[in-house]
Amino acid sequence: MHSLRPRGIIINNKTDFAMPINFGLHPYFNISDFKNLEFFDNPINCQNQEKNVISNTLDELNKINLGVDLLMYTSGRSSFRDKIFKREVTLIHPYPFDLGVIWSDPPRRMICLEPWTSPRNSLVDGFRNIMIPSNDIKRLNTSIQIKSLK
C-alpha cells in the first residue's frame, strides 16, 4: 500500500516477512522546446541507461532533443530552467531518494525528473535495496519546487 501525504510517501509492510523495495516516481514536466532548457545541480558523470555506459552528464544532456535516459547519483537536487516558459523546476530528493533519472521522449515536449531509491534490477542484485521489517513502515520524502523567473 502506498500513500502520498504532505509529510512524504509511506510504504507499509503489513506482512510477517521483511520486504525489499525499489521505489521511484515519474513526474513529467511540459517544456517549450528542448533547445530552451538549461540543466544544473547535476553531477559530472551519469549512466546512459540505454547504452549502459558512464558518460559526461553535460554531453548527454546536450542530446536531450534526441531522447535520453540518464541515471545520476545526485546531491539530492536536480533542476532545470525553461527560458521561454520562464520557470525553474527543482526536484528535491534526499537520501534514499537521491538517485535521479532525466528522461526525454521526443517529439513529445516534456521531460521527466525522477527520484529513485535504487537503480534498475536492484531487486535482483540487491544493490541499494531498502528492507522494510515485518509490520513496519518506511517514509520517503521528495518535493518539487517551481519558481517563476518573470
Regions found by a protein language model. Give the residues of each.
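Active-site/ligand-binding surface loops and adjacent short beta/alpha elements
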Residues: 17-20, 27-94
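A short, structured loop/turn motif at beta-sheet edges
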Residues: 1-3, 31-33, 83-84, 104-108, ...
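Short coil/turn motifs at secondary-structure junctions
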Residues: 14-16, 32, 118-120, 147-149
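Intrinsic-disorder/low-complexity, polar/charged segments enriched in Ser/Thr/Lys/Arg/Asp/Glu/Gln
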Residues: 4-8, 77, 86, 137-141
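Short Pro-Gly-centered flexible turn/kink motifs
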Residues: 131-148
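Glycine-rich active-site loops that engage anionic ligands at enzyme catalytic sites
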Residues: 82-120
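Acidic, contiguous internal or C-terminal segments within carbohydrate-active enzymes
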Residues: 1-21, 25-27
